Amino acid sequence: MQVPLLDLSAQFARIRPDVLRALEAVCDSQRFILGPTVEAFEQAVAGRLGAAHAVGMSSGTDALLAALMAAGVGPGDDVVTPTYSFFATAGCVWRLGARPVLVDVDPATLNATGEAIAAALTPKTKAIIPVHLYGQMADMPPILAAAARQGAVVIEDACQAIDAADSSGTAGTVGAMGAFSFFPSKNLGGFGDGGLTTTNDDGLARQLRLLRGHGAATRYHHEIVGGNFRLDALQAAVLTAKLPYLDAWTAGRRANAARYRALFAEAAPGVGVSLAAPIAGPTPDGVLSLPFERPGVTHVYNQFVVRLGRRDAVKAHLAEAGVGCEVYYPVPFHLQACFASLGHRRGDFPIAEAAAGDSLALPIYPELTEAQQRYVVDAVLAGMTRPRPAVPAGSPA
């Protein structure tokens, strides 16, 4: 059996007529840049999330970059963010000449905590970027409280978390702004790059719209220097066609996560694998930690990330078995060569480093069958219990 990490063909087969009609309508209109198709999509997403404004952007990266620019982040400013995320979270800060002030993550959720963020604030802190990693919201009230004491702008990195929610609200609507990605692998994915920035502030919304179009509200008359961050109409058409299916897809992901938990709980003890809560250090051999879901949270499972001993050996075994998997992410920001001037070293953020060494994303797309999930579970457990290769005589242990 082959089980890919993501099967976009299975999704497209079910929605093909809707998507092709939407694309044909844009082609007939010949309105490819912004225009009514993009505006309709923005209004639909804003209404869905409960945001006053949704501004379509060319990618999740540009959605985050534009939010930072709208917040006035620039040289000499500090921006606090977790060291464990997709590169753009810190990369956008760096591009504006500001300094990413990195914090470690909670071992259970791999999200930054309010306590860690509060401890990292400096007199120069202009913004805070909490990340809703893998589809689960960070605990926002303590983060918002820390930001209020500092007077810092909170920009949510919700790129993996559309429709995620907790008692504080919906991802992307709790802080001053929220950034979303519509990369094809996301729960709501386009046919290429796309993104969106949300806000409840009218002034920030106007600034975001200026920034995405080179700072011009009127063509060739530029109030500020922006960029070309526009969401094109073809992507907006695809996303609009997909949007009515998102509830069912999210429910499918959550159901698959629950089934994984049941299947691992059923099968792991019989092969000598222990299920345990995530720990701050590396996961020991023979131990498997399933994703932790905070009480009262709607986790949308863009990724189903387990932590386990001998991760690389298990990953290799899964490749042999035809099971797709991926490491999100193998190198935390503080150990990236491009951020060497920040002065960090290995050991500074041990929880993120441990997760980078033992985390593994398994297939979680909504079209997965029970048989496929059973196959994945069996393959993971077989990889965990596979005997280590014999060490040749005379070789170092």
Regions found by a protein language model. Give the residues of each.
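N-terminal "arm"/small-domain region of PLP-dependent enzymes with the aminotransferase-like
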Residues: 1-31, 36, 363
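PLP-dependent aminotransferase class I/II
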Residues: 9, 38-44, 48-52, 115, ...
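Phosphate-binding glycine-rich loop
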Residues: 29-78, 92-96, 101-104, 169
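Structural detector of well-ordered beta-strand residues that form the stable sheet scaffold
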Residues: 55, 80, 101, 154-155, ...
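PLP-dependent aminotransferase-like
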Residues: 69-158, 165, 391
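Hydrophobic/aromatic ligand-binding patch that stacks against planar heteroaromatic rings
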Residues: 92-93, 146, 170, 187, ...
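A short alpha/beta connector and helix-capping loop motif
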Residues: 111-120, 169-178, 373-383
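Conserved active-site segment immediately N-terminal to the catalytic lysine
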Residues: 156-191, 218-223, 288-289
